[in-house]
């Protein structure tokens, strides 16, 4: 129904060397959680949705994104070609995936507390855990050592606050990604 959306997946598949559409449709949650798969899959899905919207006559006056989404936004804005975007994401995902293998990190969204309250709990937790993504005034994501993230999540649950562990392979947006940042330069 949307040939332009299909072309996004085909372009990504050609550059990455694996079938992105198959990955999105058939891979297990564990396989999709691997950074080397999840980042290109999210990128392809985001850009395919954008292309489908354009086909329907829906246009954007501006685009924005956070983290990986910044690359999709730059591509939608014409700052990166589709092919170059997938090349960049391939290298970003590779570097971050290598960091993920070298650590036991985790991330968890915390709802219903201010960033300051969340930071206070993280500071008191045993091990490394910090607030990393300030998504809204009432939702912050924490990241760090898996055990420390779990302990902090337990404190939040004890306070009656909702938490959601993210299905990711590392403590992204934390100091654990510094080797990836250095490699990606």
Stretch-by-stretch model annotation:
Residues 31-33, 72-75:
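A short acidic, helix-capping loop that chelates divalent metal ions and anchors anionic groups
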Residues 1-64, 142:
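Helix-rich "cap/lid" substructures immediately adjacent to catalytic or cofactor-binding pockets
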Residues 7, 41, 67-68, 80, ...:
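An amphipathic alpha-helix/helix-turn recognition signal
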